């Protein structure tokens, strides 16, 4: 027994010795330093190159641009990254000592191969890691100055930008390049790592693509106490890459359980925009997918263009979810949309009681509408909110007034002309400082103040 205990202790000691703390300070560091508190590295990309599985990287305040200002970071090792330190690492306050990833449009030509600002990709490793415990905490992602926005179209009074533009369209007056159109956090679909991936106390703002787009093979994904504000298509999306054993189409084998458990708790998800400025599809605050067991609890999910929570991806028998204790408000079409074959049901929070046991929903309790709008006073950008609530989309035909169309009209034939579309706003840049005010807006619900 004593020999076994000794061997166990030695193994634990070896594991501890292998895990290192690496310190990075953009202002005071140098890439030739050792990466200690006293001699930090200068750049995160350098720390990621030096790191080994199990290491923790500590980031001081600053705007980290990536190697050659590419503004993406390859995370191909099972590391943790903690931000929010003062430049001398004397204290850690993420909303005071901001560790930021805030690219500039002028560098979009350097964006390289990274699909996300953080691209988690283990596929080049000889063996992908098992049993990881990767933690990302106190980080701020903002693509508001990497995007390109129209100079005048879709620009409400008092806004500093017009509507978001998808490349190749761009604002040639202000910008050098089209929008970067990348994820903020991306995990490769071919990843086969197992274990736990956590993002806590982070902010995801102004993404021109899905903000948090993570595929995991087996284990846990945790997203807790984060703010998602003004992102395009989906705020948070988690998928499972492990194949599901089936006894028939959409019939998992008896005893099967989802391989990925996703905890999405105490997050605030506001202003998720549609794919295009016609406001026709996407615009989901949160989406669950096949092979995932999602726990959606105590979040504030509101002001999303299509729906707060999308449950239409994959058959209900192939996924599970509990949706409890959330605040849903002013999502434009519905608070939840789900598959009720062969249709899509769009349901408001006051109709949730009928959903339990449907489409993989195991529990849906204690959800409510926003009781006190005053909770967002001085925390939400009032101009942005008012413009969003007043937003209109119109489509009209400017007809040819010639005799040809006159005759077509008499005969009941289709008229010919040009279609013009107009939307009051679309994914305009949201001020980062206002997005960060959303931490702590409602006690117990949504993102809480970071301690």
List each model region and its residues.
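Right-handed parallel beta-helix
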Residues: 83, 130-145, 160-174, 192-208, ...
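N-terminal extracellular ligand-recognition/capping segment immediately after the signal peptide
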Residues: 45-48, 53-91
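Right-handed parallel beta-helix/beta-spiral solenoid domain characteristic of secreted/periplasmic
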Residues: 79-162, 166-174
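The right-handed parallel beta-helix/beta-solenoid scaffold, focusing on the short coil/turn
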Residues: 20, 55, 71, 77-79, ...
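Right-handed parallel beta-helix/beta-solenoid
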Residues: 18-46, 63, 450-451
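Acidic, glycine- and Ser/Thr-rich low-complexity intrinsically disordered tracts
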Residues: 90-108, 168, 316-451
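Short glycine/acidic-rich loop motifs that flank beta-strands on beta-rich extracellular proteins
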Residues: 68-70, 91, 105-106, 111-115, ...
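Hydrophobic h-region of N-terminal signal peptides that target proteins for export
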Residues: 10-18
């Amino acid at each position: 027994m004593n020999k076994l205990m000794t061997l166990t202790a030695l193994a634990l000691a070896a594991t501890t010795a292998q895990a290192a703390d690496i310190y990075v300070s953009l202002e005071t560091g140098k890439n030739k330093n050792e990466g200690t508190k006293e001699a930090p590295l200068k750049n995160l990309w350098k720390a990621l190159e030096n790191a080994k599985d199990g290491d923790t990287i500590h980031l001081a305040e600053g705007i980290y641009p990536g190697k050659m200002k590419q503004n993406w970071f390859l995370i191909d090792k099972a590391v943790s990254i903690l931000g929010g330190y003062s430049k001398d690492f004397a204290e850690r306050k993420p909303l005071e000592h901001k560790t930021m990833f805030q690219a500039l449009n002028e560098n979009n030509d350097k964006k390289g191969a990274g699909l996300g600002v953080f691209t988690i990709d283990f596929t080049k490793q000889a063996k992908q890691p098992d049993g990881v415990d990767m933690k990302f905490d106190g980080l701020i992602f903002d693509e508001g100055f990497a995007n390109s926005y129209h100079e005048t179209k879709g620009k409400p009074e008092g806004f500093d930008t017009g509507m978001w533009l998808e490349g190749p369209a761009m604002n040639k007056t202000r910008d050098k390049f089209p929008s970067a159109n990348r994820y903020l956090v991306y995990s490769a679909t071919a990843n086969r790592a197992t274990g736990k991936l956590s993002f806590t106390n982070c902010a995801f703002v102004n993404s021109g693509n899905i903000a948090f787009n993570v595929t995991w093979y087996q284990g846990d994904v945790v997203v807790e106490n984060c703010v998602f504000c003004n992102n395009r298509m989906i705020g948070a999306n988690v998928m499972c890459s492990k194949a599901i054993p089936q006894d028939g189409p959409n019939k998992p084998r008896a005893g099967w359980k989802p391989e990925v458990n996703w905890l999405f708790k105490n997050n605030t998800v506001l202003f998720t925009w549609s794919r295009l400025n016609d406001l026709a599809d996407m615009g989901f605050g949160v989406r669950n997918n096949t092979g995932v067991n999602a726990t959606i609890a105590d979040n504030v999910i509101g002001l999303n263009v299509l729906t707060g929570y999308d449950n239409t991806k994959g058959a209900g028998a192939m996924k599970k979810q509990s949706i409890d204790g959330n605040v849903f408000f002013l999502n434009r079409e519905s608070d939840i949309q789900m598959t009720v074959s062969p249709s899509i049901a769009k349901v408001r929070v006051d109709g949730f009681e009928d959903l339990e046991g449907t489409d993989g929903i195991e529990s849906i309790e204690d959800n409510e509408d926003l009781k006190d709008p005053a909770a967002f006073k001085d925390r939400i950008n009032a101009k942005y909110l008012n413009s969003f609530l007043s937003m209109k989309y119109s489509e009209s035909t400017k007809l040819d007034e010639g005799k040809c169309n006159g005759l077509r009209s008499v005969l009941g034939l289709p008229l010919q002309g040009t279609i013009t579309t107009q939307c009051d706003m679309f994914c305009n840049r949201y001020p980062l400082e206002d997005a960060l005010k959303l931490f702590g807006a409602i006690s117990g619900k949504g993102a809480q103040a970071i301690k």
